[in-house]
């Protein structure tokens, strides 16, 4: 048995002392360590046999030594495979042998040659995640059953060759017939739309508005469907990964888009036909521009109508029409103030300007004529009447100034009359008892007055408007004083100067004598008495 010098050996000592060493030196040190381990294991077995140890301990020592050797070999292979994975040499998955030195054992070389490929593949997948997956995708795409359908969808949606061919064909047609647009414009100008009655035009306009609303509804529904499909696609992508929903949703989206496109094209064709009938699209070259302008007009009108018909909120009820609409309607009312009754064409025009309906416009004018127009007209007439009254009063003031002196003259005459009554009359045979006013004689609420027939009755203006009778002293047979009674109706007709001109009607006079004898005096008898 050979004796080896005892040396204190620590596994991995060389790696700790010098971290930067060559791979050949490391393998040589590993060989020395394995030999030393074998020697130490044999020495331990001898010591155990001397002390009468259990025979199973030999097997334990052998197992421990073999496990330690395998662990050291595994560490070496891991280092080699890590270096190969870092440099990218083992990406192809083939075996590769490295010459690490002249002292390498053949067993180690064979083990490394056998285990190199799988170790390299493991580290290749760890260092490049998705590398093999990309290769798998590249291999599976040509063999996929969805490839043909996807190619067809792409050809239908984006086909560069077909688009180029169509563009070239259109260019050739334009080059061959460059005067076609001019001819179409001439045809449209020379062939204006036939005369259409007002009712037919209104019907066509209503159809046009309905078709435009249908077109907007189709666009809105398609946008809604597209948004819902996008939500479904995003949910698929979150659960199954990016692009998982394309095979399921692309075909459905394409089919629905075709359906909406065909429906939209049909509605657009009907709209173009109606516009041509109405004469809105007159120029063929500017057809797109005219269509865009008419479209903008329709959108503007639609927005105004939506503002007009906008449903008010429950807590803030809408009162009346919008302010802009009311201003337009008021302007028209004041422009046509003398005749504020719009025609049907005026109502349609105002409805377009205000964004209201024809019924709303007519109702507003009905209310405005009652609430605005009629009070204003009444105020105007009232002002005119007040001006006329003021002018008439200013004209009547000088007449009253002329009447003033006449009344003064009457007062002077009355004074003279009273003075003459107090004087004795020598020219007549009447006594003083028949002169002047008779006081104290009242009969049935009537007042009597005895006046000589030669005197003018000028002082009657002082009497009131009650029942009044006049007694005139007349010469009659029997030599008695007779009086004539006058009723109040006859007296009421006397005023100022008229008393001298108007004759007393005979049927309203009575002949009264002091003996309570009454006889009606006819007009002829009165004349006879006055003459006598």
From Swiss-Prot:
GO terms for cellular component: nucleus. Residues 314-376 bind DNA. The keyword Transmembrane does not apply. GO terms for molecular function: DNA-binding transcription factor activity; transcription cis-regulatory region binding. Residues 412-434 have a biased composition (Basic and acidic residues). Residues 176-197 have a biased composition (Polar residues). Residues 170-203, 385-434 are annotated as: Disordered. SUPFAM superfamilies: Homeodomain-like. Residues 200-271 are annotated as: BELL domain. Pfam families: Homeobox_KN (PF05920), POX (PF07526). It comes from the Eukaryota. Residues 144-160 are annotated as: SR/KY domain. Its main location: nucleus. InterPro entries: HD, Homeodomain-like_sf, KN_HD, POX_dom, TALE_homeobox. It is found in: Nucleus. Keywords: DNA-binding, Homeobox, Nucleus, Transcription, Transcription regulation. Belongs to the TALE/BELL homeobox family. The SR/KY and BELL domains are responsive for the interaction between the TALE/BELL proteins and the TALE/KNOX proteins. May form heterodimeric complexes with TALE/KNOX proteins. Interacts with OFP2, OFP4, and OFP5. This is BEL1-like homeodomain protein 6. The gene is BLH6.
């Amino acid at each position: 048995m050979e004796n080896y010098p005892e040396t204190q050996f620590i596994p991995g000592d060389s790696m700790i002392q010098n971290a930067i060493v060559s791979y050949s030196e490391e393998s040589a040190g590993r060989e020395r360590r394995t030999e030393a381990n074998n020697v130490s294991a044999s020495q331990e077995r001898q010591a155990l046999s001397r002390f009468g140890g259990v025979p199973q301990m030999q097997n334990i020592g052998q197992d421990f030594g073999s496990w330690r050797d395998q662990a050291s070999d595994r560490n070496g292979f891991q280092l080699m495979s890590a270096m190969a994975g870092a440099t990218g040499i083992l990406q192809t998955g083939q075996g590769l042998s490295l010459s690490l030195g002249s002292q390498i054992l053949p067993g180690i070389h064979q083990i490394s040659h056998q285990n190199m490929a799988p170790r390299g593949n493991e580290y290749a997948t760890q260092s490049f995640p998705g590398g093999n997956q990309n290769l798998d995708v590249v291999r599976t795409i040509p063999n996929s059953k969805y490839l043909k359908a996807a190619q067809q969808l792409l050809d239908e949606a984006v086909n560069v060759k077909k688009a180029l061919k169509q563009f070239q064909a259109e260019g050739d047609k334009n080059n061959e017939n460059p005067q076609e647009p001019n001819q179409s414009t001439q045809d449209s100008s020379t062939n204006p739309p036939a005369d259409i009655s007002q009712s037919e035009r209104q019907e066509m306009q209503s159809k046009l508005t309905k078709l435009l609303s249908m077109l907007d509804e189709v666009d809105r529904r398609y946008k809604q469907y597209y948004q819902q499909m996008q939500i479904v696609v995003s949910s698929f992508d979150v659960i199954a990964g990016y692009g998982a929903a394309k095979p399921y949703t692309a075909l459905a989206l394409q089919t629905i888009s075709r359906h909406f496109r065909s429906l939209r094209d049909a509605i657009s064709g009907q709209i173009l036909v109606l516009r041509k009938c109405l004469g809105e699209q007159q120029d063929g070259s500017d057809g797109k521009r005219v269509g865009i302008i008419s479209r903008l007009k329709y959108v503007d009108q639609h927005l105004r109508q939506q503002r007009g018909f906008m449903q008010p909120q429950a807590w803030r009820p809408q009162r009346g029409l919008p302010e802009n609409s009311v201003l337009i309607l008021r302007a028209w009312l004041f422009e046509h103030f003398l005749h504020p009754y719009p025609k049907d064409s005026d109502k349609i025009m105002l409805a377009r300007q205000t964004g209201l309906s024809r019924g709303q416009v007519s109702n507003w004018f009905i209310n405005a004529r009652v609430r605005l127009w009629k009070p204003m007209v009444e105020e105007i007439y009232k002002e005119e009447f007040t001006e006329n009254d003021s002018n008439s009063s200013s004209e009547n003031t000088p007449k009253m100034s002329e009447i003033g002196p006449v009344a003064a003259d009457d007062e002077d005459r009355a004074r003279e009359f009273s003075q003459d009554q107090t004087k004795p009359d020598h020219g007549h045979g009447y006594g003083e008892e028949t002169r002047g006013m008779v006081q104290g004689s009242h009969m049935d609420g009537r007042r009597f007055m005895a006046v000589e027939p030669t005197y003018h009755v000028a002082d009657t203006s002082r009497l009131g408007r009650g029942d009044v009778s006049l007694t005139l002293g007349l010469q009659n047979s029997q030599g008695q004083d007779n009086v004539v009674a006058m009723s109040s109706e006859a007296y009421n007709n006397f005023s100022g100067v008229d008393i001298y001109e108007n004759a007393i009607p005979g049927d309203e006079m009575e002949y009264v004598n002091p003996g309570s004898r009454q006889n009606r005096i006819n007009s002829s008898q009165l004349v006879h008495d006055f003459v006598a």
